[in-house]
């Protein structure tokens, strides 16, 4: 029973942390781009699914993961020995021009969007379904209630490198 409770707490925390930071990062980025905000104002429910995936791609809450090589390998011409640790830069992968058209631009209608903001494979975020659910409910609800929402001042980022998010975001409604 104790393991079950611990697993539930892990899932809730993983989903909550991912959704809070993805939502905050994505909303700030969108609020700074009038053409993207216009899409949300006009039809928040119509762009919710693609918008939340773009939030994860454009400014994911986690940009850096440490990984350990399980076999000797080579990546981009660099030899990596079994047991060696590497830093996987998710933020960089989500801006790969060979995968994404106009990768440095936010596009809330981007589809397909094969981002790895939630990780991939065996390292896929356990909280991803909860994060997607929370964002898919809150995004249209927020825009329907506050359609004139705008940034009131420059948001303040948390002073961390790995888990990206904001300490405060002041908005006007």
Please provide the spans of the model-predicted regions:
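Cytochrome P450
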Residues: 1-173
């Amino acid at each position: 029973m104790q393991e079950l409770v611990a697993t539930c707490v892990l899932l809730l925390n993983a989903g909550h942390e991912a959704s809070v930071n993805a939502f905050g990062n994505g909303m700030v980025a969108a609020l700074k781009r009038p053409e993207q905000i216009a899409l949300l104002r006009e039809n928040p429910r119509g762009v919710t699914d693609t918008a939340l995936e773009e939030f994860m791609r454009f400014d994911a809450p986690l940009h850096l993961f440490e990984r350990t090589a399980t076999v000797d390998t080579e990546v981009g011409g660099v030899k990596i020995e079994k047991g060696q640790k590497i830093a996987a830069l998710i933020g960089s992968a989500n801006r790969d021009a060979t995968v994404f058209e106009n990768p440095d631009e936010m596009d809330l209608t981007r589809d397909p969007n094969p981002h790895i903001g939630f990780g991939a494979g065996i390292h896929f975020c356990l909280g991803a379904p909860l994060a997607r659910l929370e964002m898919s409910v809150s995004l249209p609800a927020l825009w329907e209630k506050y359609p004139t929402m705008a940034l009131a001042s420059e948001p303040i980022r948390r002073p961390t490198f790995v888990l990206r998010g904001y300490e405060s975001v002041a908005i006007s409604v």
